[in-house]
Amino acid sequence: MGALDDKIAIVTGTSRGVGVGIAHELLRAGATVIGCSRSRLDALPGTDAEPDWAQRSAQMTCDQGDYRAIDAMVAEVAATYGRIDILVNNAGGTVPTPNVEDVPVLVQKIQGAPRSDDDYERTVLFHSFAIQMNLISPLWFAIRVCRQMRNQDGTGSIINISSGAGHPAGSPTLVSYGAAKAGLNHLTRSLAEEWGPRVRVNCLALGPTMTDNFRSFVLPKDDPDGAQYFRDVPLKRAGEPAEVGRACVFLCSGAADFINGTTIEIDGGMLPGVLYEAGLKTITDLL
């Protein structure tokens, strides 16, 4: 028996990285998992790892910058599976910038924000996109899924994936992203107060997590294993996507039935703000 047997879960941002790690741990705990991403994929990545995962999973395409696409996706999942028990708002992310005013063309391209040759317009589009994807889109998803959860038997669980960049200490090089994640932390508490007792809302604030993007855009080129980068992290390493996934399993399970409106830091005891100088060096080297 798994902790999440017979549960239907949506996980956003499952084309790679943390989203895939979360999806796999929910599958391991017995849930049926519907992943989604902007990229069109035939299946949730890695579901050939276990014999029954492919049967208990699906991958959908969804432009999370379009509330109509979110509405259509949630409606399709509810119609296909009959209910939605879990939402993990994982999609998001950004790329560090040398400063808030200077958004190089390469950074904009990597992030996937709308393009512009005008310096000011490019900066505005970059920061607007970061706030949209890391705060507004998770709110849209939560509202739509909550409506479904309230119209079915039982209770639901929503988990927002935030970041240490949202800590009040500030996050230079990640200004709009950090502001959006701080907003997501506050949103979590507010929604928990509004939507209880039928729907619980919690948040995981991630520290450094070892994904391909983290290796490419955060770890300094002269420190590929992170030995120096992680010197100020008490556990001396990055987290793994599977560790984030196991925290999600706990928050979605009956073991967390009385946990609501909280933000749990998954960061190895990292002190706020200590890693941003290294991140700035990395993006400066990249440019």
What residue ranges belong to the model's regions?
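Catalytic loop of short-chain dehydrogenase/reductase
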Residues: 93-94, 106-126, 150-151, 159-183, ...
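Conserved glycine-rich cofactor-binding loop
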Residues: 15-17
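A conserved structural motif in NAD(P)-dependent oxidoreductases
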Residues: 233-244
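Conserved glycine-rich Rossmann-like NAD(P)H-binding loop of the short-chain dehydrogenase/reductase
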Residues: 29-45
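A glycine/serine/threonine-rich, flexible loop-to-helix segment
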Residues: 44-52, 101-109, 206-233, 273-287
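Short, small/polar-rich loop/turn modules that mediate ligand/substrate recognition or access, typified
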Residues: 196-200, 259-261
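Short C-terminal tail/terminal secondary-structure segment
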Residues: 94, 249, 260-287
